[in-house]
Amino acid sequence: MKSKYEPLFDKVELPNGVELRNRFVLAPLTHISSNDDGTISDVELPYIEKRSQDVGITINAASNVSDVGKAFPGQPSIAHDSDIEGLKRLATAMKKNGAKALVQIHHGGAQELPELTPDGDVVAPSPISLKSFGQKQEHSAREMTNEEIEQAIKDFGEATRRAIEAGFDGVEIHGANHYLIHQFVSPYYNRRNDVWANQYKFPVAVIEEVLKAKEAYSNKDFIVGYRLSPEEAESPGITMEITEELVNKISHMPIDYIHVSMM
């Protein structure tokens, strides 16, 4: 092995003091293999255990924090207390070989699939029509009410509590890839005229809610990460200038890492 790669195998300490055995991370893999109700299936466990063997952190597939947020079939759920037992099995499998196990907490927003959403009621920061996972025709999303936005924020906090109860070492907040948090940051998706027109207000509120749950139910060792997409093709969309401002805001919060997803 070339010497320039050797640092990848060195231990690294996160801002919260947790030590990782190396610098390799298994990014979340969309496997569409959870049970229809979002509970963890027997197929998932050996799949994720095998892939978690030699990394420092392993992150489970995007897990919906609310039934009004499911973006693809076979998506794991962290929306209900009844999900916790299956999530315990998942966390155990992910940690079996020494990796820190995180669950990615997620809300699809406009990318929700109507057939997987209660009453087919897809919500987004502003009204929009688009194609999502596997769709040949567009579906429409309506604008979220203030109450629905506040509930979505609380849902991320409750998902964090469930992750803690299930034995995960942390959560990754999914703020990338055109899903709900990304949509609030993007001027393409967020055309509101109220307080939520501030594109940084929603992601910051979600992080604050997650950190509040961490403080209430866990300790400083619980890892909190944030995933973002720095640019998008849509116009007007997220630019590097917008992302720089977002990073300036969230990097001053007690999170442990930022995960960049180039989509």
Predicted regions and their residues:
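Flavin-dependent oxidoreductase catalytic cores
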Residues: 1-263
